[in-house]
Amino acid sequence: MFLAQPRGFCAGVVRAIEIVERALEKYGPPVYVRHEIVHNKYVVESLKAKGAIFVEELSEVPPKAVTVFSAHGVARSIEEEAAARDLPVLNATCPLVTKVHNQGKRYTSKGRTLILIGHAGHPEVEGTMGQVPGPVLLVQNLDDVAALTLPPETPVAYITQTTLSVDDTKDIIVALSKKFHDIEGPDTRDICYATQNRQSAVRQMSKLVDLILVVGANNSSNSNRLREIGTEAGIPSYLIADGSELDPAWLDGKKAVGITAGASAPEVLVDDVIEALRRIVPVTVSVLPGREENIEFVLPAELATA
């Protein structure tokens, strides 16, 4: 059995969870969180047990209650609603998501029409589209690019959802560059390091295994993409929440299993999957070499000394 490296929690997820935990310590429960803090049921249930209450709308938050915005970011209208209600807010938006917001604002301030490459309905996409003033055109695939009716001479710029890697977006960016004569976009070094690193690790691991298990939630965009990458490499790949979802039939005829985890999946769930495998077959675990991650994001000032 091989473990991909890196895997699991990224710095933005660690920061978001710590914000909720420190808020509970400093202010006491309940602390209200708009949307799942990260897309993982285990994490959400663990925080619920400590006193966090998860809501989808601010109208569900009582007056004066401490409120946390999830790692995915929110639209300006949500920020304005919270301010109008005088809710004490802790913003757990990933700093790399905030960076995308700021890039979009800079492009539109220069008079460019903004194109967002991302998944419709994803909370990060909804937040980004609501943060940038003016219209934002969402494209999910090459067909969406072909359907754009802007004149070719229109000054445009593009930004991308952070859970999409350079590899995920390169074909769309090429198509946009062919369609529009005046186009700007962020440096490829600006993409989310965690997305790129985890996808690259799965591609490398796929050369060594004949089965890939991705630990993560069904509603986790980056976890789903890791499974897709394994499948694209020709390796049977499955997304599972924990060891209870492991199907012994998947192991029939398999000699080497690879395990990775989405950016919002804690290592305890990886351990759970390994134990589930051990109950079926003898297991020797090897951690693959990979890019080391030492990035940390600062907490909001209100919690820095909590």
Curated annotation (Swiss-Prot):
Protein residues bound to (2E)-4-hydroxy-3-methylbut-2-enyl diphosphate: H39, H72, H122, T162, S220, S221, N222, S264
Pfam families (UniProt xref): LYTB (PF02401)
Name of the protein in its database record: 4-hydroxy-3-methylbut-2-enyl diphosphate reductase 1
Family to which the UniProt record says this protein belongs: Belongs to the IspH family.
HAMAP family: IspH
Binding locations of dimethylallyl diphosphate: H39, H72, H122, S220, S221, N222, S264
Gene Ontology molecular function, alphabetical: 4 iron, 4 sulfur cluster binding; 4-hydroxy-3-methylbut-2-enyl diphosphate reductase activity; metal ion binding
NCBIfam families, per database record: ispH_lytB (TIGR00216), PRK01045.1-2 (NF002188), PRK01045.1-4 (NF002190)
Note describing how the cofactor binds: Binds 1 [4Fe-4S] cluster per subunit.
Catalytic activity: isopentenyl diphosphate + 2 oxidized [2Fe-2S]-[ferredoxin] + H2O = (2E)-4-hydroxy-3-methylbut-2-enyl diphosphate + 2 reduced [2Fe-2S]-[ferredoxin] + 2 H(+); dimethylallyl diphosphate + 2 oxidized [2Fe-2S]-[ferredoxin] + H2O = (2E)-4-hydroxy-3-methylbut-2-enyl diphosphate + 2 reduced [2Fe-2S]-[ferredoxin] + 2 H(+)
InterPro entries: LytB/IspH
Enzyme Commission designation: 1.17.7.4
